[in-house]
Amino acid sequence: MNKEALKRLIAVAAGREEPDLVIKNAKVVDVFNARVIQGDIAIVDGLIAGVGDYSCKNELDAEGQYAAPGFIDSHIHIESSYVSPEELGRLLVPHGTTTIIADPHEIANVCGLKGLDYMIEAAKRTALDVQMMLPSCVPATPFEHSGANIDAREMEKPITYDEVLGLGEFMDFPGVINGVDATIEKLLVAKRAGKPIDGHSPGVSGNALNAYASARIGTDHECATVEEMHERIARGMYVLLRQGSACYNLRTLLKGVTPVNSRRCLFCADDCQPKTILSLGHLDNHLRICAEEGIDPIMAIQMATINAAECFGLKDRGAIAPGLKADIVLMDSLTNCRVEKVWIDGVLIADSGKYLPEIKRHDISSTKGNFKVKDFSVKKLKLAIQSPQAHVINILPGGVVTSKEVVAINRNSDNEFVYGHGQDVVKIAVVERHQNTGNVAVALLQGYGIKRGAIALSVAHDSHNIIVVGVDDTDMACAVEALIAQDGGIVLVNGEEVVESMPMPIAGLMSDQCGEWVEAKLTSIHSKAHEVLGVNADVEPVMTLCFMSLAVIPEIKLTDMGLFDVTKFDFISLEA
């Protein structure tokens, strides 16, 4: 801000000059005093000049509706929405979200730092304020091949970018707790830059949590219980209450939120797909859930706004107060939270559920060409097992956590696994797509329920190799080949024919289409997965499959290097 701009702001605030816009007759949510005040909001040059008695030529009568600060999602992966940053902005802003803190570690695992560059540039084309975090753990583990390896040395330049707010969720909590040199060097990169560090510490407690928090890792979104939440708050951390498309802890953790500790609580979605946004909303849905759970509505709005701003050092937003960004949400009530209008930097961006700006998309060519699959053939899907029993990946309710089970299997005369009709054990394979290694790891999956054909994805956390499940090797190979041909996404095959697909040309992770198109495609994919291929009715076919390669979530998962026991932190044999 220059001298003239500051003088004008002060003059408007004092009433000597006319604002650009006045929102009249609003019930203004005062997040500092946890109250509602009646007044007009004066806006000039994208900033709030004051709350009080103002007038100008350009006035909007709020008619007694509630004006709240713009909502801030404190942790989200844009890639998991399956749409581009520009499109996610179009979907989120009408629900009152004006800022998101995004961790692009999915695309970084595929494209490396050029993936971060793409996300930064694409995000500039949306009115939504996207604050990028620098991915901290690429790859997430050394037990798989990813498209990049970002070490501390490579982090030193991007951590200084104005567009990079801090260091993304630090999933390598064992490395922090045990003081591993390479891990400590990454933490120091952020500390030297004076930027915050986002956390990820599921199940960590006691002295281990002390060790993790001592590195001044400031947040955690992985709490499963109120006790874990309270322990983290006691260690000086902020706790993110999550309500997304895949994982939820909001209702559970709200039971532990009090007027005393609520200012250490923030909202996040983590992963949020178009269907969820279009049917339920975003942080406005968090607020409705808070109302259902009996949480004071002003306290809930603090968690959606000022708490996140203070946690991440965003001193220019989070409240309706003089000198702050004019990011304002007008809504009908503090319980129903139906968003009517949204301003970002004083400009009306959404009105009655409609995103107003024209969408201009960034070029995606830098994110394409990420399928380097060497010598793949149906023969690589054969699975010889020398014992009549095998370790299988058993899907538990929720579709993310698995258990290690031993089951009797069907084999042919060459000791190769054969799918038995009526037996809920099928082949699952991970095909390496980044480094031309030719790796194809095959294992067994239980609880998915597929009875015909195959499903292949290029979204497979966290390294995003190709993952495929099926009852027939030929169909599995057909699905993999079709997936490569369409530059990634989702493919369903039955009888060597593609019965449904969704191309995702942005790194094999995101569609270049609108959210409504993605929702319709996913609805069709889910329907055909259940009705044509026979996937169990209680299994979300895409989300469940994409987590079967995530080697940091117990108990066993499959990477391109083999069957991995997360508890033992080592590979195990299929034979039991």
From Swiss-Prot:
CDD domains: AdeC
S-S bonds: none
Record keywords, A-Z: Hydrolase, Manganese
Pfam families: Adenine_deam_C, Amidohydro_1
Residues making up the signal peptide according to the UniProt record: none
EC number: 3.5.4.2
Required cofactor(s): Mn(2+)
Gene Ontology biological process terms, A to Z: adenine catabolic process
Family, similarity comment: Belongs to the metallo-dependent hydrolases superfamily. Adenine deaminase family.
Protein name: Adenine deaminase 2
Lineage: Bacteria, Pseudomonadati, Thermodesulfobacteriota, Desulfobulbia, Desulfobulbales
Record gene name: ade2
